Amino acid sequence: MPGAPLLYTPPNYVATNVLYGIGVLFTAPVGTALPSDQNLGVGSSWVSGGWTYVGATDQGVSLNYAPSTNDINIEEQTTPVAVIVTNVSLQITTSLSEETLANVNLAYGNGGSLSVTAPGASQPGKTTLVLSTSFASLACAVVGKNQLGFARVLSVPTVMSAGSVKTDFRRAANARLYPVTLSATCPMSSVSLIDLTAIATS
């Protein structure tokens, strides 16, 4: 007696899990607390809590995760018996479109100092950025929207800005951009993704 028909019935995919849209990048001094869970998606709560919004970007924010590994091999097996992680690079990259001195400092390592001179007699007001190669650590967070329309937050407690920066001064080709590369310098166990899934019950 023949068996049951052989069927091909793949599981259903969830189209609403396919996400798109911008991520908002905030930076802060190391140790700055995140907003309360209730306010993770509220931009003003970040700013009032000591975080700085980097502003407009050229092509959004990118997350780059690159582990380096070492294969453990034995003669009796063609594939590795284990793959050991030797180091990990986690970077948040973007190109800043808003040319403020704070953003220039962030792109150039976040080690500079800003001083403000008030206007006075024969003295125009000015702000001076003095750069430094003593790069300073900072915290960063990327806030996006999840499939429920709530906030999803990548929190990296300690990063350093240490990437190459090339800014073109052109008459009309494009805006002046300041590329930023924020490299995680904290243990991976300190990095977290927070996903809001439901409103509070009261």
Outline where the language-model segments fall.
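A glycine-rich, hydrophobic loop/mini-helix early in the fold
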Residues: 44-88
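Mixed-charge, glycine-accented linear interaction segment located at domain edges/termini
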Residues: 150-202
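Beta-strand elements of well-folded, non-transmembrane domains
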Residues: 67, 96-100, 144-148, 160-162, ...
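Exposed beta-sheet edge/beta-hairpin loop segments within beta-rich domains
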Residues: 81-85, 129-133, 166-176
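Ser/Thr- (and often Asn-) enriched beta-sheet segments in non-cytosolic proteins
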Residues: 52, 60-64, 89-93, 113-115, ...
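Polar/acidic, low-complexity leader/linker segments enriched in S/T/G and N/D
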Residues: 1-54
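Oligomerization/assembly interface segments of phage tail-like spikes and tubes
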Residues: 82-102, 173-189
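Short helix-loop boundary/capping segments
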Residues: 101-157
